[in-house]
Amino acid sequence: MAPPQRHPQRSEQVLLLTLLGTLWGAAAAQIRYSIPEELEKGSFVGNIVKDLGLEPQELAEHGVRIVSRGRMQLFSLNPRNGSLVTAGRIDREELCAQSPRCLVSFNILVEDKLNLYPVEVEIVDINDNTPRFLKEELEVKILENAAPSSRFPLMEVYDPDVGMNSLQGFKLSGNSHFSVDVQSEAHGPKYPELVLEGTLDREGEAVYRLVLTAMDGGDPVRSSVAQILVTVLDVNDNTPMFTQPVYRVSVPENLPVGTPVLAVTATDQDEGVHGEVTYSFVKITEKISQIFCLNVLTGEISTSANLDYEDSSFYELGVEARDGPGLRDRAKVLITILDVNDNVPEVVVTSGSRTIAESAPPGTVIALFQVFDRDSGLNGLVTCSIPRSLPFELEKSVGNYYRLVTNAALDREEVFLYNITVTATDKGTPPLSTETIISLNVADTNDNPPTFPHSSYSVYVLENNPRGASIFSVNALDPDVDQNAQVSYSLAEDTLQGAPLSSYVSINSDTGILYALRSFDYEQLRDLQLWVTASDSGDPPLSSNVSLSLFVLDQNDNAPEILYPALPTDGSTGVELAPRSAEPGYLVTKVVAVDRDSGQNAWLSYRLLKASEPGLFSVGLHTGEVRTARALLDRDALKQSLVVAVQDHGQPPLSATVTLTVAVADRIPDILADLGSLEPSAKPNDSDLTLYLVVAVAAVSCVFLAFVIVLLALRLQRWHKSRLLQASGGGLASMPGSHFVGVEGVRAFLQTYSHEVSLTADSRKSHLIFPQPNYADTLINQESYEKSEPLLITQDLLETKGEPRQLQQAPPNTDWRFSQAQRPGTSGSQNGDDTGTWPNNQFDTEMLQAMILASASEAADGSSTLGGGAGTMGLSARYGPQFTLQHVPDYRQNVYIPGSNATLTNAAGKRDGKAPAGGNGNKKKSGKKEKK
């Protein structure tokens, strides 16, 4: 069997395909670098060895080199570290010109593996070229009649950089007539255009010097400037044109000298000198120039001599119109003379006055003139007349003389100049007449006072205005002239609130501007009534007055003031009582506030700002009533703290806050017991005092029944009472029966009283505040007038031993009685017009509790009489000590009655009692409790 034949050509083809595949795969992984232009020679471009996966020492082993198609070798390999570096300075503009991207491509050849690796290096442009104008100075000539928005190309600017480093914009020095706009061709350079923003006037400014700045967008920005000289050229492109080529007119031969015959008109659309047209005669004889004259500015042709039909009946005149530079136009004027009676009457004013006072009486002579006619016979007889509408008349004088006189009063303010036309007419056929105008000026007299356009003024000024600010301006008009019309302003003297009016406002005598000399306060001054006087400078001066009402407008500059509860002065916090059995909506108290502002600045709203137990209480938005929002629970704390904010509706709103302390308990003993459990006893004396208070309150229930029985017995046997008291001789004070009430009265008594316990924040002791009850009869003995009444139980009082005294009943104290408006009651018991409401009969209950506590304290001692010592208010037990409460301050100073400025006071001269002598220790304790 023959061996298989080999095909060497096929093997070479397979090898070539394998090599090409290897090179193609290597070429797919192209290496890219990016460097800025203008790098120094040998600058690092990229780590080519790392990117090829070789080591630096393998460069020579593998035969790694750069294969480039260009003649210039831009890059080279560093044999030491195998990095690609620049072979020299690279200028992007020289290499790629204006191409957006500059890419340099070459290959890295690994000879031993025959692998080619394409490398692409992007040369990034830097801002190394400044925009350059091809010309640094350029003159632009513009016709003065160039239309706005006209464009004028300027010199080109060249910047070889690309992108943001190339030319980006232009800036023109500030000028209102020109602006610069940038134009650019598609993929071409940018060039500026000068844009005319408005019309030019060569006579106003003939040359403009502008500075044009070209800027690129590099960092930093490079720029260059060029000077632009704009010259405005004058244009005369319109020739004067007559309105018609031939003018024809016919005039009578008796036309007076100087009478206009005809007016020719030529128009020139140019402006300035180019539009100024002058007129002149052309190609006329000397005789014609003596008869007619032409106004060079108006084109009016008039007679300069008498016309005579018999001498010449026709005239032909040549007229030329010419502008400043010399453009001209011509026309013909044909004048025909008509044959008429050529002698007209003539009027010659021989004497007269051109000015007359407006106060001149009727019959004053103004002028004397003469009339005559050159004709004879009837044609020479002349009559004169003036318009009947004028306040003048003609009077015949000697011969052909006439006098012009006034026949009515003159008023310069109505007519200050009269042009009196005197018409002279002959009796020819047809009659001829002539007119002469006599001008008469009417001189002013001071016969008109200054008048204000309004009968009165109302000025509104916000309060707190700055001093010296102008608040209003008045203007009086005087129809007179000169000195008679010069108006000065002043204010009538007056006083306001004990101060002169001039201390509030002043007025500028020349301008009539009213200034405020002080800052107005709406709460102190709400309006001013002023009288402004306007006087002229005539002789005698005339004046008029106008009323000016200045109203001060309110600003929200007063925060709400809280009237109830009053802010404490002794450091303690007033406590409101809310029973635990209170239902939702129970009225606990009411916050009463006022605002001195007015309008919506005084509208108040109340809100609960902070509460120790959220959701337990609510505050009425408009009433300020503090009510329970839900039923009270056992877990609710005894002491509840509420912060109520009162805010007005001003802009910006102002507010005030008040802190309320609410004690949650059904009875005062509960409060004392809870307070005793809240704070441990720090001193033995404090514990004893608390124990005494608890024992005294516990005895109330026992004493109360006996107290009611005694009151009922006294009411039924009141007629025996005085006899029994006189017979007893035991020192009991007599008590009128009318001072006691029965069981039903006590029940009503309980219902009409409320209580208020003022608890200090650091003590278990309480101040029981007794308000005035709402009945007139009060049990008060003589000693109660001489001692303080608040029930503050101290150790001194417990240690005081009663001594026998001669008791005597004092008459009722009228200072303790309220007027109807001052009586406390529920928040709804008073009319809506009252200034405040009393929350929930709190004083009444407090009064009853104090009376019962006083009785219980005396009963506990067992040595007092029923008349009572001072401070018991006539309710002490029969065998109790004389309980005086002499060391306690007068509670009535702490009682505030909303809606009234009344203060609970004792009778005059009986308020301050002297304290009994005691030990030093007892005095210190009393002082400490008074401070609390």
UniProtKB/Swiss-Prot annotation:
TM segment ranges: 693-713
Membrane topology, record value: Single-pass type I membrane protein
Native organism: Homo sapiens
PROSITE patterns from the UniProt entry: CADHERIN_1 (PS00232), CADHERIN_2 (PS50268)
Composition bias, Basic residues: 922-932
Record protein name field: Protocadherin gamma-A6
Location of region: Disordered: 804-841, 902-932
Feature: compositional bias, Polar residues: 806-841
